[in-house]
Amino acid sequence: MKHLWCICVFFLTSCATKGILETHILQGEPGEVDVIVFSSTDCPIANAMAPEIERIHISVQNAGGDLFLVHVWAGRTNIDAQKHADDYGLTMEVIIDTEHELVDSFNATVTPEAVVVLYDEDGTPKVIYQGLVNNLFDSPGNRRDEATQHYVRDAVAAGIKNEAISTSYRAPTGCIIEQKQ
């Protein structure tokens, strides 16, 4: 039986386009892992991470979980989000969070920022990792040729195996999420 993540009920912009969620309650089976990635259509760091985010999505989906891409900037439309997904080859579900319900629930500060959730034996959700997707960027404008550390991949693998994660938070590098007034 799926359990609900009670603090996260999201009321989102309605959309006829498949893949853009109208409403979603985060829920999962015991031992399942879900990933939330905060993103923006115009953040160059988030866009550079798109291929890795898609690879993580496929891996999480193959393990029975979900990856949700959350667009956080005010003024984004379903059309913007769908065009962005198409342009970058992203196939996961997209959430438009212009009211920052998710941003506030997870205290997200930049895009891209990832949250890995593991559902325990009772189906109760627990954040097991939050922060950097990988180490492709040391800081804005300071990009490696390729990532050498894959923090979200490692957290997902550890969560699936119910193993401890050595570092549950890594300060993310990216475009600052402007707080709602």
Ranges and model annotations:
Residues 4-12:
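Sec-dependent N-terminal signal peptides
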Residues 29-44, 156:
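Short active-site neighborhood of thiol/selenol oxidoreductases, capturing the structured segment around
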Residues 31-34, 63-66, 90-92, 111:
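Loop/turn elements at helix/coil->beta-strand transitions in domains of secreted/extracellular proteins
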Residues 40-42, 69-74, 139-145:
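Second-shell loop/turn segments in exported
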Residues 43-46, 114:
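The canonical Cys-X-X-Cys-His
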Residues 47-87, 98-105:
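Structural microenvironment flanking redox-active thiols in thiol-disulfide oxidoreductases
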Residues 99-181:
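Thiol/selenol-based redox catalytic cores and closely related redox-interacting motifs
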